[in-house]
Amino acid sequence: MRRLFAVVLAACLWLGFAPQASADVAGLTPCSESPRFIQRAEAAATPQAKARFENYSQALCGADGLPHLIVDGRLDHAGDFIIPSLLFLYIAGWIGWVGRSYLQAIKSDKDAAGKEIVIDVPLAVKFSLTGFAWPLAAFQEFSSGKLLAKADEITVSPR
């Protein structure tokens, strides 16, 4: 029984792993060589559209002639996905950090609920202008212990 289990396990592991897929062999071609892309580029009417097609001619296109986003971790496509996603995470963190700071600042106010609904614009602008350094501020609060709540401050559900 052990040998049968070992053989079945070995077969599942051996057959279960798929070879690494690469976009270069997945039917994608450089857009500058794609007939459908060239047809679309020639049909562009405005100078802005022609410039856009010129920029996209360096990307990889499918059979439909449309550029595809390559998200496989190779650094030659870093400008396509990694850099914009890091920028998105930075901006989302900025917004979250500014909102958190604003809520902490109005918490001690007598009309805190009102200031959550009707935002105190000068105070919010003050926090939004200092929010660009949120990664450093978050690291500072984490290392000092102010970022995380203490265990006795966290309520436990009675279920």
UniProtKB/Swiss-Prot annotation:
Q: Which InterPro entries match?
A: PSI_PsaF (IPR003666), PSI_PsaF_sf (IPR036577)
Where is the secretion signal located?
A: 1-23
What Gene Ontology cellular component terms go with this record? photosystem I reaction center
Question: Which GO biological process entries does UniProt record here?
Answer: photosynthesis
Database matches in Gene3D superfamilies: Photosystem I PsaF, reaction centre subunit III
- Please tell me whether the keyword Signal is annotated for this protein: yes
Which top-rank group of organisms is this from? Answer: Bacteria
**Could you tell me the keywords of this UniProt record?**
Photosynthesis, Photosystem I, Signal
Carries keyword Signal? yes
Q: What does this protein do?
A: Probably participates in efficiency of electron transfer from plastocyanin to P700 (or cytochrome c553 in algae and cyanobacteria). This plastocyanin-docking protein contributes to the specific association of plastocyanin to PSI.
**Which family, according to UniProt?**
Belongs to the PsaF family.
Its recorded name reads: Photosystem I reaction center subunit III
Please give the organism.
Synechococcus sp. (strain ATCC 27144 / PCC 6301 / SAUG 1402/1)
